[in-house]
Amino acid sequence: MFNANEQVSSRDIVLCLDVSGSALPYDREVIQAYLNFIEHFQGERIGLSIFNSTSRTVFPLTDDYRLAKKQLQYAANLLGGVQSQSRINRLQQRQYQEISDWLEGTQNRKNATSLIGDGLVSCAAMLPGFIYGSAHNNHKIQSRFNRSSSIVLATDNVVSGKQTYSLKQALDLTKQAKITVDGLYSGAKQNENDDATLEMKQLIESHGGIFLSQRNSDSVINLVKEIEKRHTAIPQGAAQSAFSDDPGLWVLLTVFSVVIWLAIAKRMKR
């Protein structure tokens, strides 16, 4: 049927996961939260990037939810085996290899792990209009429907090695590009009040994002709900007219057109 005011979703979401040894056991909760929530997506695009010393795009921005769910479910199944030392001890060689294959490409720099700023910039590069270097991001090119962009950054903010971008520099770039970055602490509960965690909280919030610790039982779901609530408003101009895929409508229109054409042709013969 014809809908003169069909709303087009305007959200792009990148899941940006730290897969260093200290953060990897907690990533499954983030993935599982989005697996549950993706059921309610209608036109949103979602992508997944993982990083340690270097980054790998697991899947780019897509609204192919079948593909996204398949990739997220596979990752959730894999990471279920590394959530505790006892589970790690029970892994078979095949499972070790599958996890290693999934992480391939994230540790290409020697003597460096968990380069948070670099990982965040790589995640931002998945979003339309982001350009490396601060001079250009003030002029971010907006897509046709002015899509909003957000990143969910899950990390414990424990850096080891020299970064190209600090977390602050990366957040400055994303803010200039009008990309919202929300932070999720992915680390051991006893380290929640460490300087690195408090610094991450301060930087995320000062750049307009939400910071939560996923050690609270429902905090991952709360973060997801807050992101969804933030982006539910459709920008002006995002409504468009559209025909649904209804063959009955096209048959009626075709018949109507033929009738009109025959009437005109008959009148012209007179």
How does the language model describe each region?
Residues 46-104, 196-201:
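Short beta-strand-loop
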Residues 12, 203-247:
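Juxtamembrane amphipathic/hinge helix adjacent to a transmembrane helix
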